[in-house]
């Protein structure tokens, strides 16, 4: 697979020209193109699972991994997963693990979203991603089914080498997931970041006040019953995967092309090209804050693009809409219905 070889520095320079200033109408921060056949309104709450593009032709199961969110809104996911769900932490960031077989991405409190890498099959026993307080989303690596939680800053983190890991959310919105899990669920912390543990089989993740989402390691997984699919407001429902919803799981809503998390923060592509949740309004310098859709294939898209990149940051990955470095892998963010189990 061919990747774009752009430098982070050059990306920051070129994108800063159209960056969002706090007084600007952020709802107009949309890409110039739209995804053909994409759904811009979805009537049900849904999560996302990270599916590496190299393995999207593998299994198309009915149950996928949800991503959690931590408090800061960041979202992170694991790598080499089969079906890992990502959580969200408080800052809104989303992060996922690495070397998972199906890793879902979580969200932490600051709204950032991160997903795992090298995942194989999601949609059957997939992992949901959690959110931490800052909105970032992060996932672990080498998990087989790691769930990601959410911490207060919104970051989301998830594990790696997971088969079905759910990600939680922490307070900052970041999303992170664990690594080497088989089916770990991630919780949410206050900043929105989402983080998950490593070496877990199925570990549920909790949420801390900053929104970050973190999950334990060396846990085991359970089978999820199959409820009715979620309704949509236009077109044919493209979402064919589902996973159990738990505390801290990254929960998203799509209305009029605007993506929000469970705390009402805005899903955006920020100045460094990272996907996270902030605000409202989105953080200063944001590039896109609208123009989201679900593709006919069931993937999350921004504009006419449904390819995202999970880039290694320590023991987790952050999610970006562009290839920003050598340790980045192309992924799809698969939409999955969240059900009460």
From Swiss-Prot:
GO terms for molecular function: structural constituent of cell wall. The keyword Transmembrane does not apply. PROSITE patterns: PIR_REPEAT_1, PIR_REPEAT_2. GO terms for biological process: fungal-type cell wall organization. PIR1/2/3 repeats lie at residues 64-82, 83-101, 102-120, 126-144, 145-163, 164-182, 183-201, 202-220. Keywords: Cell wall, Cell wall biogenesis/degradation, Cleavage on pair of basic residues, Glycoprotein, Repeat, Secreted, Signal. Covalently linked to beta-1,3-glucan of the inner cell wall layer via an alkali-sensitive ester linkage between the gamma-carboxyl group of glutamic acids, arising from specific glutamines within the PIR1/2/3 repeats, and hydroxyl groups of glucoses of beta-1,3-glucan chains. The record marks 74, 93, 112, 136, 155, 174, 193, 212 as: Covalent attachment to cell wall glycan. The keyword Signal applies. Transmembrane segments: none annotated. It holds the Pfam family PIR. Residues 19-63 form a propeptide. The record marks 63-64 as: Cleavage. The PIR1/2/3 repeats are required for the covalent linkage to the cell wall. Their number varies among different strains of S.cerevisiae. This is Cell wall mannoprotein PIR1. It comes from Saccharomyces cerevisiae (strain RM11-1a) (Baker's yeast). The gene is PIR1.
């Amino acid at each position: 697979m061919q990747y774009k070889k752009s430098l982070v520095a050059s990306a920051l320079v070129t994108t800063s020209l159209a960056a969002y200033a706090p007084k600007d109408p952020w709802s107009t921060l949309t890409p110039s193109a739209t995804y053909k056949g994409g759904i811009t309104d979805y009537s049900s709450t849904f999560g996302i699972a990270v599916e590496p593009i190299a393995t999207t032709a593998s299994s198309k199961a009915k149950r996928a991994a949800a991503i959690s969110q931590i408090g800061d809104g960041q979202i992170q996911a694991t790598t080499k997963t089969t079906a890992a769900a990502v959580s969200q932490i408080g800052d809104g960031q989303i992060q996922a693990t690495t070397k998972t077989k199906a890793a879902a991405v979580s969200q932490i409190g600051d709204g950032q979203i991160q997903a795992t890498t090298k995942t194989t099959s999601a949609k059957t026993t997939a992992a949901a991603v959690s959110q931490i307080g800052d909105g970032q989303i992060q996932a672990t690596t080498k998990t087989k089914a790691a769930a990601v939680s959410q911490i207060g800053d919104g970051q989301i983190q998830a594990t790696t080498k997971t088969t079905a890991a759910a990600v939680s959310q922490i307070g900052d919105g970041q999303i992170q997931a664990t690594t080497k899990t088989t089916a770990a669920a991630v919780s949410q912390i206050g900043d929105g970041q989402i983080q998950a543990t490593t070496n877990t089989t199925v570990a549920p993740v909790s949420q801390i006040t900053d929104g970050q989402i973190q999950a334990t390691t060396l846990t085991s997984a359970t089978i999820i019953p199959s409820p009715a699919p979620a309704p949509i407001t236009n077109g044919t429902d493209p979402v064919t995967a589902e996973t159990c919803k738990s505390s801290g799981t990254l929960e998203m809503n799509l209305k009029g092309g605007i993506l929000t998390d469970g705390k009402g923060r805005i899903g955006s592509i920020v100045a460094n090209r990272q996907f996270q949740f902030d605000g409202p309004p989105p953080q200063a310098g944001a590039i896109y804050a609208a123009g989201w859709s679900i593709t006919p294939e069931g993937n999350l898209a921004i504009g006419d693009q449904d390819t995202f990149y999970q880039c290694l940051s320590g023991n987790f990955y952050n999610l970006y809409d562009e290839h920003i470095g050598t340790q980045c892998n192309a992924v799809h963010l698969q939409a999955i219905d969240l059900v009460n189990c």
